[in-house]
Amino acid sequence: MNEIKENKLLFLDIETCGSYATIEELEDKNLILFNLWNKMGDSYFRRHYPEDERMSSGELYKKYSGLLPEFGRIVCVSAGFIVNDERKIQSFIKGGEEEILKETVNLLNRVHKLGFYLCGHNIKTFDLPYLGKRMLINKIKPSPIMPSYDTKPWEIKALDTKELWNFGSYKGLSALHLVC
């Protein structure tokens, strides 16, 4: 990737949580997702996190549902950028998820027209796919700056600090607090 000027970066981060507070609420309000969680989500986390094997399905839902866009929702999107050597930060937190996503798309459309790159830690494999899926679930058209089904990995206009820190390796530790 060619050198990117810092005044052409939009630093982006999302915060997520489960769509419902408890698995009982999920069962009451969305039986299809409840059955899907019991069939797939529950077993996925038991397989990948053996230390949580003894947790109930409800405990697993509470702990992990926010990590999957099918079972979670976005509660905050924060964006930072540099204008005239001054750092600016904007967070979208008011209203529900749909309002947050609409404001995010408006911002992304504006920076796309200005030739910006997106920047974040694990942005390519978490934030952008999560945003895209939640936008589709909420019937909101994603911004053209976001990757779509036919975008090749090298075509994504995003600088991922996790990738930068790993220097091409997938084995090292690269948690954001370790990088900082």
Which residues fall in each region the model found?
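Conserved RNase H-like, two-metal-ion catalytic cores of nucleic-acid enzymes
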Residues: 1-110
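Metal-dependent phosphoesterase core characteristic of DEDDh/y 3'-5' exonuclease domains
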Residues: 2-7, 72-94, 111-180
